[in-house]
């Protein structure tokens, strides 16, 4: 996964082509979340103008499709497929969800996976968020609870980072259609 920042916004195509030639799966993301130690992610993030220029290409590389979403839309596939384990054994629902719910040094990984908290998070829908199910940007947005938590300490709030990506997608989508 390549995070796209102000510094490297012109070289992700080279990395993508290298991965394609070498049959390596590749993902690219311009949603830069605040650092786990200090809230400085916005210093590296692309402006809306910069993001609009490349968002369609990022979406094509990642296979993103614009779809209508009901209030029961499950917002995050990774929460149903994987866990993130920190260097000290902390288990987090994903790499963006900066909150440990267990520790592999003390708990069995299968028990952690089957835990109610993980299941609840993996079934997070638009209606579980504060405003996502009624937002006009909903079909363009990732609605990432991990980014919302990193940005504002509330996984159900509207993430400004996700909102900026959604605006860039909408501007590109409306320009084409």
Question: Where are each of the predicted segments found?
Answer:
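Radical SAM enzyme [4Fe-4S]-AdoMet core and its adjacent flexible, acidic
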Residues: 1-107
């Amino acid at each position: 996964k390549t995070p796209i920042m102000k510094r490297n916004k012109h070289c992700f195509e080279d990395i993508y082509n290298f991965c394609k030639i070498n049959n390596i799966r590749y993902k690219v993301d311009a949603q830069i979340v605040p650092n786990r130690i200090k809230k400085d992610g916005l210093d590296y993030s692309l402006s809306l103008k910069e993001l609009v220029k490349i968002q369609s290409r990022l979406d094509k590389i990642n296979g993103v499709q614009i779809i209508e979403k009901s209030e029961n839309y499950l917002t995050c596939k990774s929460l149903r497929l994987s866990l993130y384990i920190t260097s000290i054994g902390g288990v987090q629902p994903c790499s963006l969800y900066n909150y440990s719910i267990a520790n592999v040094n003390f708990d069995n990984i299968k028990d952690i996976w089957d835990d109610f908290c993980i299941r609840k998070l993996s079934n997070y829908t638009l209606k579980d968020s504060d405003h996502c199910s009624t937002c006009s940007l909903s079909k363009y947005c990732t609605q990432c609870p991990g980014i919302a938590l990193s940005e504002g300490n509330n996984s159900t709030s509207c993430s400004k980072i996700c909102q900026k990506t959604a605006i860039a997608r909408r501007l590109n989508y409306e320009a084409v259609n």
